[in-house]
Amino acid sequence: MSLIHRYQNNGYNIVLDINSGCIHVVDEVTYEVLPYMEEGLDTAAIVGKLGDQFSEEDIKTSVAECEKLKADGMLFTRDVYENAIDTFTKNRQTVVKALCLHIAHDCNLACRYCFAEEGEYHGRRALMSFKVGKKALDFLIANSGSRHNLEVDFFGGEPLMNWQVVKDLVAYGREQEKIHNKKFRFTLTTNGVLLNDEVMEFCNKEMGNVVLSIDGRKEVHDFMRPFRKGAGSYDLIFPKFQKFAESRNQDKYYVRGTFTHHNLDFSQDVLHLADLGFKQISVEPVVADPSEEYALREEDLPKIMEEYDLLAKEMIKREKEGKGFKFFHFMIDLTGGPCVYKRLSGCGSGTEYLAVTPWGDFYPCHQFVGEEEYLMGNVDEGITRPDIQKEFGCCNVYTKPACKDCFARFYCSGGCAANGYHAHKDIRSNYEIGCELQRKRVECAIMIKAALAED
């Protein structure tokens, strides 16, 4: 298993020291020297290998500099985390930090790619009652231990179809904060159909983040996100989303889209949203059954990779022109970020994070809702399947065979358990197309950092 990852992008020779996280932008000599150093060749042998390409002096200088970086723990560092994560997993006390409240298993759109089947999640249409939501918040408080900051996402379906209950639960949460010394961060995901000034005003006061669903260009959005009778939704929601983003000072929100086989030129959708003034953008690859006509295929990968490269270059250009924006999948923290245990074990689904259905059932996350083998309990009885919690708690990059040799493992934390389950019926497996795209996004994100660091 290599300890470094080398790649070339946009004219940069980039070397990632996988286990330390150090990034090196190197010259041609060093780029070619490094593989031989990792093989264990000495300076003389490397000169013999590369002497017809570079001068002996340049090769010796490069080797000496790399040896210094190695001695300083910045190159060819070893993985010291496998035993540590095992100990951490066995000894940590699980606390619940976040809930995804399915406030509405109903929707007013009929999006073609919806994993929730128009909000029904393979079941019945339903709205969460205040009573069930209250019990969910009580469960979160009771199972959060000493943790002060808690998160609750209002999700659907379409949450605004049950707006009064959203408001009532926020009010209840604020009351409980004072009693239990907790702080709730509420978030909301909406398709915008029912968005109005009253909703915006409430969200700007109470919601730490809002996710606004829009796929990009009008023709793309209207094809994938129509009303049930077939009409498009772009013209209705777009001006409302613009107003909402401005009312939040272009912060603490995302416009979030999905690209599919039908719009492989998705960089144009990202740039369309940026041109309309949005500063916080996420356009993500669809995850779908391969039989769906909109599903991404292996043969789509070269085009998708090309699009990520195009987008990265355009983002650098716009940033230098003072017209920059954030793209969620290119956001990477090279100086701080989560602790190593978080980076190795992922999002916390099934342990620190749970989804709650309208009738109060617990699942590991929203993408497992309806999968009865992963029904974990309910708001009345609590967790009745601790074995599921344990199964998810033991899920990390070292228990996923495909992750052990992947250079991006400290950035993706092993990927999405639901994607692995839906691809191979195993939460420790990986969705291969998703892994390929994740690696590409990490490469682009690092390249952007390198390019902007030059100025």
Residue ranges, per PLM feature:
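Radical SAM/AdoMet-radical enzyme domain recognition
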Residues: 133, 137-153, 162-286
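Short acidic, hydrophobic short linear motifs in intrinsically disordered regions
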Residues: 40-51
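Conserved alpha-helical substructure of the radical SAM core
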Residues: 53-54, 60-61, 65-72, 76-79, ...
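C-terminal accessory region of radical SAM enzymes
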Residues: 302-336, 366-413
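Acidic, low-complexity/disordered tracts enriched in E/D and polar residues
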Residues: 1-37
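Cysteine-cluster motifs in flexible loop/terminal segments that predominantly coordinate metals
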Residues: 394-444
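Short Fe-S-cluster ligation motifs
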Residues: 137-155, 392-394, 429-455
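Radical SAM enzyme [4Fe-4S]-AdoMet core and its adjacent flexible, acidic
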Residues: 219, 223-235, 242, 246-349, ...
